[in-house]
């Protein structure tokens, strides 16, 4: 069905007169600077369609143009024509290939701003993803006169009730909060024709499935249901058979892991991980990085260690207050800080295009988590680097994840080539417009919200020079197994010791400009 529609659109090209008419509406609109970074085939291998070929509203086209969207990606080419017909869709595509716009554009097109009823509900698993998705809706629909509301847990219910007293056309939120509003009769979903689930594999986990099914009960029976994710476990098939009407299935996953992301591992003892991380910071040319830990306690501890080493760092995890998490996410996305330490809170759908390095300080336990983590780099087909710090206990997970994903994670080489993850003009990376910028070097208290040290950085996000600005550093490749004769390494003590006192009682002094020689041998 999609191929017939898209092929017909591709063959129906506009006349020169029509093309000149279309160009007129662009007058007075300001498109952002073009992103000149190279892209991989999963976003460039299109059928040659333009957004104009979908025959969507002129006002929506204006928002798409001002957002900097040039041509639809493959997932957008496949999804938008079918979604505009109102058919149910089950779409599987890689992280960072344009899934959000694939469902936001047809959703905006089908909403009638003259009807003061909620006409679309977009469910996401996390608060950060809800904020990001709602912003995409507002950006693309800025000329449509559509009201978009984001509603998540962790904020006051009273504020949501007040906002719903005015017309809201699209609600973006997490399942629990939306069910609360619908159950109280505050959110009227009786005329909500579009039901979208992003990161559907997470939303259909045992934690969320009962809530999602209850929410569907508030919708009309002829609603359109669209599910999007990078992975579809068996629970998705069960939901499809029960709640979807002959959905059109789209699968663009010729391989699970993202093209354009180079994956390495370094075998290090637990107590040496911080030193290894310090080496990576000194040797890699990092624009922005996300560092993952497996627990909230380790997130805070590692963030503190990183600031002690003299690097700028934020942290975020699920136990933080929501307004603090929002502030960290907003500032990091706007380039205020180079490094973010977090738990798996930010593995789902978060799109920060400036991130070119992901480091698994703690190796994930399963392939699904690994896939979503490394997908935070290399967004929308750009290049990225994923480095995994592996200890003795992680080796079995490493082998299993390689087998399940059909990929090979290579030992870290002595030299990591810049062309694998570095681009020439970081100042041209698309960033959201920040309403306020902090002054260079500004410190914020370490109150459990953020840990910052902007020393040597441009707070506007143009990270040229300063810490982490070196490139092509020397790394000692690590073996998966310990060297012969050493046996199993001893269990490390926590995260390693930074600035430990010497045996004679004197504090070890560190030269901030010292270049470590490489990760220690396991």
From Swiss-Prot:
Record flagged with keyword Nucleotide-binding: yes
Extent of the signal sequence: none
Motif (Q motif): 49-77
Molecular function via GO: ATP binding; ATP hydrolysis activity; mRNA binding; RNA helicase activity
PROSITE patterns associated with the record: DEAD_ATP_HELICASE, HELICASE_ATP_BIND_1, HELICASE_CTER, Q_MOTIF
Ranges spanned by the short sequence motif DEAD box, renumbered to the chain: 198-201
Catalysed conversion reaction: ATP + H2O = ADP + phosphate + H(+)
Any Pfam family: Helicase_C
Biased amino acid composition, Low complexity: 430-446, 453-462, 487-516
Subcellular location: Cytoplasm, P-body
Ranges of compositional bias, category Gly residues: 463-475
Region described as Disordered: spans on this chain: 427-522
UniProt key word Ubl conjugation: no
Protein function: ATP-dependent RNA helicase involved in mRNA turnover, and more specifically in mRNA decapping. Is involved in G1/S DNA-damage checkpoint recovery, probably through the regulation of the translational status of a subset of mRNAs. May also have a role in translation and mRNA nuclear export.
Domain comment, as recorded: The Q motif is unique to and characteristic of the DEAD box family of RNA helicases and controls ATP binding and hydrolysis.
Name of the molecule in the record: ATP-dependent RNA helicase DHH1
Name of encoding gene: DHH1
């Amino acid at each position: 069905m999609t191929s017939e529609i898209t092929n017909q659109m591709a063959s129906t090209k506009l006349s020169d007169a029509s093309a000149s008419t279309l160009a007129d509406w662009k007058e007075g609109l300001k498109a952002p600077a073009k992103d000149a970074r190279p892209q991989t085939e999963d976003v460039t291998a299109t059928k040659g369609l333009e957004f104009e070929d979908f025959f969507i509203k002129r006002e929506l086209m204006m928002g798409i143009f001002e957002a900097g969207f040039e041509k639809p990606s493959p997932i957008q080419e496949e999804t938008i024509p079918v979604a505009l017909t109102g058919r149910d869709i089950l779409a599987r595509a890689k992280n960072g290939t344009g899934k959000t716009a694939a469902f936001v554009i047809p959703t905006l097109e089908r909403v009638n701003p003259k009807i003061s009823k909620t006409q679309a509900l977009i469910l996401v698993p996390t608060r950060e993803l809800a904020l990001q998705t709602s912003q995409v809706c507002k950006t693309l629909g800025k000329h449509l006169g559509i009201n978009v509301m984001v509603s998540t847990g962790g904020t006051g219910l009273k504020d949501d009730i007040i906002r719903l007293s005015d017309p809201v056309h699209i609600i973006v939120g997490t399942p629990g909060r939306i069910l609360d509003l619908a159950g109280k009769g505050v959110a009227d979903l009786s005329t909500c024709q579009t039901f979208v689930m992003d990161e559907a594999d997470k939303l259909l986990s045992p934690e969320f499935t009962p809530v999602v099914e209850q929410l569907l009960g508030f919708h009309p029976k002829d609603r359109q249901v669209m599910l999007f994710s990078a992975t579809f476990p068996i629970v998705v098939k069960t939901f499809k058979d029960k709640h979807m009407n002959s959905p059109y299935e789209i699968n663009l996953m010729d391989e699970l892991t993202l093209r354009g992301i180079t994956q390495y591992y370094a075998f290090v003892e637990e107590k040496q991980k911080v030193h290894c991380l310090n080496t990576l910071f000194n040797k890699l040319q990092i624009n922005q990085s996300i560092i993952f830990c497996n627990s909230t306690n380790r997130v805070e501890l590692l963030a503190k260690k990183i600031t002690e080493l003299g690097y700028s760092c934020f942290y975020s995890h699920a136990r933080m207050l929501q307004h603090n998490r929002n502030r960290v996410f907003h500032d990091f996305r706007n380039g205020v800080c180079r490094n973010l330490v977090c738990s798996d809170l930010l593995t789902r759908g978060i799109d920060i295009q400036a991130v070119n390095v992901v480091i698994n300080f703690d190796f994930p336990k399963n392939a699904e988590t690994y896939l979503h983590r490394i997908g935070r780099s290399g967004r929308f087909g750009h290049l990225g680097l994923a480095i995994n710090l592996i200890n003795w206990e992680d080796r079995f997970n490493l082998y299993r994840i390689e087998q399940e994903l059909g990929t090979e994670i290579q030992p870290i080489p002595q030299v990591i080539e810049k062309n694998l993850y570095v681009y020439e003009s970081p100042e041209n990376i698309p960033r959201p417009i920040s309403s306020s910028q902090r002054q260079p070097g500004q410190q914020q208290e370490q109150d459990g919200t953020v840990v910052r040290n902007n020393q040597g950085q441009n707070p506007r996000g143009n990270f040229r020079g300063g810490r982490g600005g070196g490139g092509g550093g020397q790394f000692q490749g690590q073996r998966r197994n310990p060297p012969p004769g050493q046996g199993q390494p001893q269990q490390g003590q926590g995260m390693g010791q930074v600035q430990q006192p010497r045996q004679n009682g004197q504090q070890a002094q560190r030269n901030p400009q010292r270049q470590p020689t490489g990760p220690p041998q396991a």
